[in-house]
């Protein structure tokens, strides 16, 4: 059950290296910065904002650059991780704060973890949802993803690399594509074991949506919620959002000086037991004693898919607020 708001949501725009960045805030107290993933917006945190405000925090959910009402630079390399980290720093400064707890989901978890790694003086703690922390390093990302799936299938990350390719699939029917994508990764509507995996595209002219469920919405997603997401992407297009994937090799090169580096601040991880983003990275979770020495707890929610804070808002809110309370001592 969603908590009743303790104060009205406040929309505002702040200046960042990207130009402008839209955010929504609620509550007063220590700053908690919420960073969404793909393909989402600040709205993905709609059930966390009132809960955090009620618990005594200034909760701020941003539209990451390239999304929603935030700036959308044209250059592909404007979506490199280093720039997204500086956006987060700029938000904290623009809000008149010196530090914040940063919490991210999906790509937002990566952005949050690198923000904490590179700017520990600003981000005093980090919460990660769905995507575990894996330190910079390893083989070149596109080399890894290019080998996944074999000769018949292409991994979705590789499919997203070529500018315009995924846009051509998604943008003619944004609403239908989003509905299918959200359903494909939700616990109550994801394909059954043995059915074609929606993380892959058939190499012979296939589309991602060919493997999505049709005619069904997950329980967490109402038609009104879908209207919000679809309306934003129908207005903005998908290129800014997809450009995050197109910077993975650049990030790998630029973060090389931090190869293997741990995040030492207090941290929290919450994953879904049915989420491929969590299960495929089980080795990263096993390495947490080394990579997240400040880890307070790591939780896997049973029967939960990828959209964790929307699928299981009450549990996520409780875990977040309990953890945040430990940081105030």
Segments from the language model and where they lie:
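Glycine-rich phosphate-binding loop signature in dinucleotide/nucleotide-binding domains
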Residues: 27, 95-98, 327
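Flexible "cap/lid" subdomain of the alpha/beta-hydrolase fold that forms the substrate-access gate
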Residues: 4-9, 21, 69-103, 107-296, ...
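A short loop-to-beta-strand scaffold at the N-terminal edge of the catalytic core in hydrolase folds
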Residues: 16-25
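Basic/polar N-terminal segments that are highly enriched at the extreme N-terminus
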Residues: 1-12, 328-329
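Short, hydrophobic alpha-helix immediately C-terminal to the catalytic nucleophile
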Residues: 46, 113-117, 317
